[in-house]
Regions:
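N-terminal alpha-helical interaction modules that lie
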Residues: 1-47, 149-151, 155-156, 169-191
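Flexible helix-coil transition and linker loops at the boundaries of alpha-helical arrays
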Residues: 3-7, 25, 41-47, 78-88, ...
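Hydrophobic/aromatic side-chain positions at a characteristic register within alpha-helices
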Residues: 28, 62-65, 100-101, 135-139, ...
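Soluble non-cytosolic domains of exported or imported proteins
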Residues: 30-34, 48, 64, 68, ...
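Alpha-helical repeat scaffolds
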Residues: 40, 69-82, 105-120, 142-156, ...
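Alpha-helical adaptor scaffolds
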Residues: 54-132
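TPR/TPR-like alpha-solenoid repeats
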Residues: 60, 98, 136, 171-175
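Elongated scaffolding segments in large macromolecular assemblies
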Residues: 123-154, 162-166
Length: 191
């Protein structure tokens, strides 16, 4: 391990142990999140071959911070993902999960999922990760947009496997059925 890698890991370990200072245990929500984000940023710059900072940002701090601070950590992950997408897609996929389920921000989740789909090499990233955008569109009752996206992915060669196409087609069909049921329920409740 080189000197830069050792310094990067030491910085990450310092940040990771930030909740135990001089014998006092702090609650994560009480942390100085902007300072932690700066430490993680510096550690990622010092040791760019490590994803440890991105793991801490997406798995630890983004899940525990307030919404505004969580977005700072997720943006850090997204920025570093764009530099090495095929190596860092795992952390962006978790950022998508946090944006969707912790922040309840489907637009941010779709933004990240679009980056994941557009910037990664299909040969190096699992299909499920590259399909997240389609699933998010279906979940948001945007089946037509999801259908157009699947057609574009098919035309561009991003979908080459028949089973993958069948899975996406089935998911689109389920999404349309759910959307139809929701529309009927709204109509009935508005009467």
């Amino acid at each position: 391990m080189g000197e830069r890698a050792a310094v990067g890991y030491a910085m990450n370990l310092y940040v990771q142990s930030f909740d135990a200072q001089a014998g006092a245990v702090l609650k994560m929500r009480e942390f100085d999140h902007p300072a932690i984000a700066q430490w993680l940023e510096r550690a990622a710059q010092v040791n760019p071959s490590s994803s440890y900072s991105l793991m801490l940002a997406s798995r630890v701090f983004a899940e525990m911070a307030s919404d505004a601070n969580s977005r700072v950590f997720l943006d850090l992950v997204h920025r570093h993902f764009t530099a090495r997408p095929n190596e860092r897609w795992v952390w962006l996929s978790h950022a998508i999960f946090v944006a969707r389920h912790f922040l309840q921000d489907p637009e941010l989740a779709r933004h990240y999922s679009r980056s994941l789909r557009e910037l990664t090499d299909p040969a190096q990233v699992p299909r499920w990760a590259r399909q997240m955008e389609v699933f998010l569109l279906v979940e948001q009752n945007q089946a037509q947009a999801a259908q157009l996206l699947v057609a574009a992915m098919l035309q561009s060669g991003q979908i080459a496997d028949q089973q993958e196409l069948e899975l996406l087609t089935q998911r689109l069909s389920e999404g349309r059925s759910q959307g139809d049921r929701r529309s009927q329920e709204k109509t009935l409740t508005s009467r």
